UniProtKB/Swiss-Prot annotation:
Motif placement: Gly-cisPro motif, important for rejection of L-amino acids: 137-138
Protein's name in the database: D-aminoacyl-tRNA deacylase
SUPFAM superfamilies membership: DTD-like (SSF69500)
Subunit structure as annotated in this protein's UniProt entry: Homodimer.
Species lineage: Bacteria, Pseudomonadati, Pseudomonadota, Gammaproteobacteria, Alteromonadales
Written domain comment of the UniProt record: A Gly-cisPro motif from one monomer fits into the active site of the other monomer to allow specific chiral rejection of L-amino acids.
Subcellular location: Cytoplasm
Gene Ontology biological-process entries: D-amino acid catabolic process
Keyword Hydrolase: yes
Signal peptide: none
EC number(s) recorded for this UniProt protein: 3.1.1.96
Gene name of the encoded protein: dtd
Annotated Gene Ontology cellular component terms: cytoplasm
A Pfam family per the record: Tyr_Deacylase
Amino acid sequence: MIALIQRVKQAKVDVDGQTIGAIDKGLLVLLGVEREDDQAKMEKLATKVMSYRIFSDEDGKMNLNLKQVGGSLLVVSQFTLAADTGRGLRPSFSGAGTPEQAKQLYQAFVDYCAAQGVPVQTGEFAADMQVSLVNDGPVTFNLQV
């Protein structure tokens, strides 16, 4: 399971010209599911995302996590993160989870984070989405479990 996380000042996701999810300070999470992923991997990744210390403390050091700064999550499904780009000029998605598996784990990720008290907004699974953000830093990390 892969999460590309970006520290943002604000982010939103639109579908068909309508904003369906928006946050101010927090993390934009692009979430990719791979074939071997399961509930345990999802929980491990969700915990890591929420606990990852990428917000600055009073000394300017990355020492605070999402909950410590009162931030929110915008979680967007992104199957292309599971692409194999090692050969050729066209990505292969053979390692990506099935749509059913990905949808279930995506929703479980959202629910798990919300249950931990983190405000969560989402995109629409498998929709054509337009994501806008103001990246803070920029600070971007690729987390994988």
